[in-house]
């Protein structure tokens, strides 16, 4: 036909997903940072996917040139409906780096959140003034000017796992594809565009480069001569809070548009 439109709505439930969870200490396991042998696979999770898929096309002839335009739109929402134990959190993503203590997970599976949810400490720039330093040292007595400011989200005067918050997921809000095909006599032309919007990515390479003081950003980090910078000051301790994995500092917008084929 000259034109067409197709719309699909769906909902799919998956039960008893096979997931890797940490072996409890009561089982005699000794967890080792950066290793995986303290984890085992078991069926513990239920997942729900729901969304919409739209496909459309339009054919038209411009004299001797035949064309076809087609597009598709996909929006999928998923969330972990439940895990086997109430309030359980399954750590699902560790940055791919060598440093042992920096392998604190940044992605989790938790009831009510999407798959690949980033649950990390929120940061609020760097400590820039003596007044900010004095206030922040109530949370971290070892803090210095130029350090990242972690947010005490629950307001209890302490920084711990309870302060970690949901900061997006690697699941996109939607995906779009657009194709153009044209034919003139013995000549064919086609181009495909693809776009993703709303997904969050964790820049592990940036985190590693910061921790080893090899990232070009660090030239512009906070100093007394550059007092407005939100790039944290490099520290000699590679486990310093400025380069810890589990903060939103290394999260980035993963949206993009690209030409897939031409």
Q: Where do the PLM segments sit?
A:
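Outer/extracellular conduits and scaffolds centered on Gram-negative outer-membrane beta-barrels
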Residues: 1-262
